[in-house]
Amino acid sequence: MSIDRILKQFLYKSIKPWQNKNIDDINQGEIYNIITNKSLTDNTINSVKRSFQNRLNENVNLTNVRKSYKKIKFVSFSLTKFYSNENNVFFVKLKIEIFVCDSFNTSLIRDFLNLITSEDILWIMYSVEPVILIHTDSKDKILQETYLKLECKAVKSQLYLNIYVIFDEKRVWTKNLVESFFSTIKNGKILNISNVPKLGGLCFCYVLNNLLLKANKKNQLAEIKIYQHTKYEIPSKYKIKFINESPLFLREYTGSLNFLYILLSMLLDNITNK
């Protein structure tokens, strides 16, 4: 999905001259004209937010879920003003958080992941910062209490992919569960995971690291932040960085010697295998 198409979808119901047009009839020049020659007022921005919110609510029924999880902010949307650079090229900065339940249409996530990973827009990635927050509340409680936040941005030629995972430390992870959890990453393709035992707590970060190592093919920098929480509080924080597919462990923890031991073991395993 092209950046033009995304902008059309966000702006379609907000720009009066476009309301009587078919969305596919809006050409690139008209988009440039709206972005570069007219200032988007707060009312327009709010209209875009409401439009997106309405589309979300068509796919997601949050009524019952909100009653159970009142402390969590499920759906939020922020959109900055549009602007142009010296070459008259417009950019958009988005921050989106989406709550996902069983009835959610996963194509929405995949479309947005296509947007942030598409080859034809990587050259403007340094000005695009999309964020997706996913929470799945399935009937069999798979992935319950688990959150995934994707944040993608680029600086010069370096693409930064940040993945934030907040999960219940008592959750037991299996190979199929991990595959299911990351099935929407990389344009919806399930990444291959081999020899993954039952996982719980800190061991999960090792599998996550392997996933990112396989995903990084263009000297990308991937950063993982893993949080353990009890009743939505975050007592411990763990951070692991990969630079050009070489692990650099940066630890931020509160008295967890066991976690330090795991990190050292992982580092030794990595050196031994090279």
UniProtKB/Swiss-Prot annotation:
Q: Where in the cell is it found?
A: Plastid, Chloroplast
Which named protein is this? Uncharacterized 32.3 kDa protein in rbcL-atpE intergenic region
Q: What is its main location?
A: plastid
Its lineage opens with: Eukaryota, Discoba, Euglenozoa, Euglenida, Spirocuta
What keywords appear on the UniProt entry? Chloroplast, Plastid
What are its GO cellular component terms?
Answer: chloroplast
